[in-house]
Amino acid sequence: MSTNKEEEHQIVCTQDFLRQYYVSESVSIQFGLNNKTIRTINEEEFNNAAMCIMTRTNYPESTLKRSASTYLLNSYHKKPATLSLPFVFGDTINLSEDMEDNNENNLLYSDTLYGDDSLTQRGDQVVYKIDTQEEDSSFTLLQSEANETRPLSSSSTPQILQSDYSVVMQEGQTSNGSIFQFSSP
């Protein structure tokens, strides 16, 4: 697959999964848009989204479904809630090959849910660089988050997930692009 094809698929996967499969027409107000609700998705939509991610990451289907189904079946109605899914999007290469048999794989498998996490202190776009031989190698962990219509508590403290990094996606107003943000211990 050519680089152009990979980049095209990466964009489609990100937008289709986060904007269509997990949310209604507009994503949560926490992402900078207007709709505060998150909807369930049917089995066909979930399978399409799962296949889209697996195509990019080459991770086993069972790993993806364990994380995603935990959210879809048990937690979508518990608001606020945050889900960490095993997304990996490389800028120029498929990083699953570079990270194979590496303890850093644990970063990709966190499906711990936590609630009432304020996004107000998270600002800049982040692409976390991995120390590999490829200078352009990078990955971004994505999360899908939904909150109740009530205001977020400014005193709430986000809990660190099972992995070392917790990454939250928030929509920015720069041409409606996505800003991927992270917090580390």
Swiss-Prot record:
Gene from which this protein is expressed: REC104
Alphabetically ordered keywords of this record: Activator, Meiosis, Transcription, Transcription regulation
Chain coiled-coil ranges: none
Domain of life: Eukaryota
BP-aspect Gene Ontology terms: meiotic DNA double-strand break formation
Protein's UniProt name: Meiotic recombination protein REC104
Annotated region described as Disordered, given as residue ranges: 146-168
Entry keyword Iron: no
InterPro entries: Rec104
Annotated organism of origin: Saccharomyces pastorianus (Lager yeast)
Biological role: Potential transcriptional regulator that is required to activate expression of a number of early meiotic genes including HOP1.
